[in-house]
Amino acid sequence: MSNQPFLQARTNVPAFRLCGLLLAVLIASVPDASGQIFTWTREQMIRYTAQNPYERFPDGRPKVPDSLLEKVKDLSAEEVLVIAGRGYPNQFADGWQILHPGKKLVGRALTVQFMPVRTDVADVQAAEWKEKGGGRLSHQTAIDMLQPGDVFVADLFGSIPTGGIIGDNLAYYIWKTTGAGFVIDGAIRDLEGISLFDMAGYFRAATPPAIHNVMVAGINIPVRIGNATVMPGDVVLGDREGVYFIPPHLVKEVVDAAEITHIHDEWTRMKFNEGKYKSSEIYGSPRDPALIKEYQDYLKTKLGAERYEEYMKKKSPPR
């Protein structure tokens, strides 16, 4: 079923959200931000993602390597929780409807923010976008920017009455373009059709009407998804519990820590399978010196001597 034209009806709208106010303050405070209501310049993108250690897309968005994204697919939400201790406690969003609960979503965030439509603002936005050489400003403006490995992340302020931002045709385009999927803090439509696609998707509800009564406020800018702050280029990890948005500079650290966890879990279950120990003797960590040594030897074998020594140095830095 085709998605209907992007409407700007002058009817009652949901309350203006605090995130929009904060975004307006943020954009107003950025030097040389005039005319950049829709997206950051490359320089601004680099400034706000300065800790990114990887390559970038032409627009400045961080480009975490595909090889690292493959490793993220082996992670669970619990294994990403370590970023909370690194100053990022607001990177997880839950309470979703999940398109295919057994299929993980991994990719780089391309963000788009919407607000309840206000005609005078929308008219100026559309005119400025046209002056920059853009076409009709709509949700498809952001969708057409997607690259392989991207995740379409849409901040629709959790609204359901404003209709479904994508139906089966646009969902199919997202799937075939990115190979990943979408996170939509709002509604989708054509769920029966979308469910036939082998893609990952997270959304709040499904509803028949097409999107209306909203306007694009920004593309590839910070957005709020649930209780998470999402930056363009964040690595998206969705599993059965919810969605994590991982800052690029922490991705490798998370992956490395998860490898240790996997090895520990493997050893723990091996010991449980022996049927000789109470759970508290093995999990969370063994206390018996012989078992401690056995685990350390197992870890060293799995990691290799060099990586094991590096891990132990980080775990117990010299005083």
Where are these regions (language model features)?
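N-terminal secretory signal peptides that target proteins for export/translocation
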Residues: M1-A15
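Bacterial N-terminal signal peptides
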Residues: R17-S29
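Boundary at the C-terminal end of the N-terminal hydrophobic targeting segment
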Residues: A33-G35
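Amphipathic alpha-helical packing elements
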Residues: W40, M45-K73, E79-V80
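Buried hydrophobic positions in well-ordered alpha/beta secondary-structure cores of metabolic enzymes
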Residues: G60, I174, D234-V236
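Feature captures the catalytic cores and cofactor-binding loops of soluble hydro-lyases/lyases
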Residues: V72-E79, I83-P232, I246-E294, L299-R319
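Channel- or pocket-lining gating/hinge segments that regulate access to a cavity or pore
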Residues: E241-Y244
